[in-house]
């Protein structure tokens, strides 16, 4: 087990999670363990802690599968395409992972094996995966809340602590990942030539700056004032009473209590399902409705490229088709 705080190279980590350990004990093949340690140590210089833990999690699952199904395999040179095909069936049917999750893990494993193959000069493991193996969610669409669901949810935010309510409104208006909202710093807001900008430090990737409206800037400024008064020694805006950052699980705990106590329902009559990333998807769909180009949407969402933007456009088109179905059916009958 590695405690990353004790290494000479400490990767970027998410302060709201506080996860610093890497556990290699489940990898029982000696060569597998030695090589993956070497690879992940090199990644500590360039990748965030969350990415490194994801790589270890994906490799650990594969190593456990190989130990259980093919215990005779001790070296990377002995891994075959047939074994990979067995693993594809296993991860898609026996693990309970969603298509997005197992596709992500397969892509991570593919990249790791390719890197290991180049490191050890083992050509065969660089080509064990086919491009089609890691394409399970090409047709998957992001999920978004309807306008009515957002209104019902926001009306109940007054039941939360005011600062937590501000956090959730700001989260919706920024369209950020929840860890990026919860780790906003007090110096995030700036002004230039009468326009406001916010600096967002993405825990997964990088730092970027984007414009915000006067209304949102005023809400952020109020949250900063409250934070400075209640916790003068912290650099962050959104803090618990004990001065610690909110974790996403703690946030969900408070919000879910609010949902059940106030009987907040979705459009199908079920309890409102609070998913922080769905607000980001909703924000992305709203941007497509504003007729923005893909590059502008990607910049506002903090994406490095435009690869995922078509998913938001497809979701918007499917929602529009559903909303107009009754009218179109009636017109077809005329």
Which residues fall in each region the model found?
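Charge-rich, intrinsically disordered N-terminal extensions
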Residues: 1-129, 156-159, 169-170
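Flexible interdomain linker/hinge and immediately adjacent N-terminus
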Residues: 7-24, 121-155, 199-206, 238-246
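Short, charged phosphate-coordinating catalytic segments
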Residues: 118-122, 171-192, 295
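Basic, Lys/Arg- and aromatic-enriched nucleic-acid-binding interface segment
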Residues: 148-178, 280
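Active-site-proximal segment of tyrosine recombinases
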Residues: 180-182, 274, 281-284, 291-303
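Conserved tyrosine-mediated DNA breakage-rejoining catalytic core shared by Y-recombinases
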Residues: 184-221, 307
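Catalytic-site neighborhood detector that most strongly recognizes the C-terminal catalytic loop/helix
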Residues: 201-206, 301-332
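Active-site/catalytic core of tyrosine-dependent DNA strand-transfer enzymes
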Residues: 215-270
